């Protein structure tokens, strides 16, 4: 039974607009072979706990009084699960019928596989079917073959990623033909089936990465330990764009992104690299601010990003007050330059 092998862990934060349809999509994908779902909530105020409590079936609610971040919420679900595999996902994701079973089987065939995903397509509306040739008419999929670095982040803030989305030195991903087995450096943050023992071995997600870069950090630590990550065309994963943080990005989430990227750099590339990246990215943002003010009359200003860098510098590389909503998880040091940040293990 799938329930003996896989637990679905989904993180919610005021997600009632998508949660009812999420449960239906899981039911469709696991028809006749249901598995347990753990709803890990980060202090929602939209009645999600009552809604889950009224549902029948293999459902459990793991609530938290405040928002502790995406990775910290996933950690609660991974710890509570008792199956050898866990599916970590957003509530705006759908997987084709039988897909969970296919991914579990795929990983069972590869003992060193720590994580696997189907081929992911990002859409505005859920398709009526999961026909691969319709969702991927060119037969190509975008997968990660590298990790974020100062060049990819400079291209992000300068806009070069938008103009040249397929240049390998500007982005950490490439497009390749869809096939049964694609070894990758990281999985898409919206979905992945993971070997629970491997996650426990490396210490789960780093709670200091409140939002963004948590999957990059996890993937890098898994591969450092000798584990493998894969994307397979055995199943299709649909992510509905327009409902998550990337689509509703606000000034708050943009500042969280800044802090997470520098913490990731500090953790894996060292202090000197991170400070060099800090000033290089700040310089690019400065040029962007000047252009918007002088040429576009202040429209689309990046001044809040520029000001964050100044405040962080005055803090000695700390996280400026207000960056992490509600202060985040108790006892967690979010300062990106903190000397206690360990290197990858």
Regions found by a protein language model. Give the residues of each.
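Glycine-rich, basic loop-to-helix element that forms the pyrophosphate-binding segment
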Residues: 63-81
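A short, conserved alpha-helix in the catalytic core of glycosyltransferases
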Residues: 177-179, 185-236
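Acidic donor-binding/catalytic loop of UDP-sugar-dependent glycosyltransferases
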Residues: 47, 71, 93-106
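Short aromatic/hydrophobic "clamp" motif used to bind/position activated sugar donors
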Residues: 86
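Non-catalytic, C-terminal membrane-associated alpha-helical segments of glycosyltransferases
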Residues: 252-260, 271-345
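Acidic/His-rich active-site region of diverse nucleotide-sugar glycosyltransferases
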Residues: 105-202
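Short, well-formed alpha-helical segments that are part of the catalytic scaffolds
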Residues: 15-30
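A conserved acidic beta->alpha catalytic loop
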Residues: 25, 41-49, 66
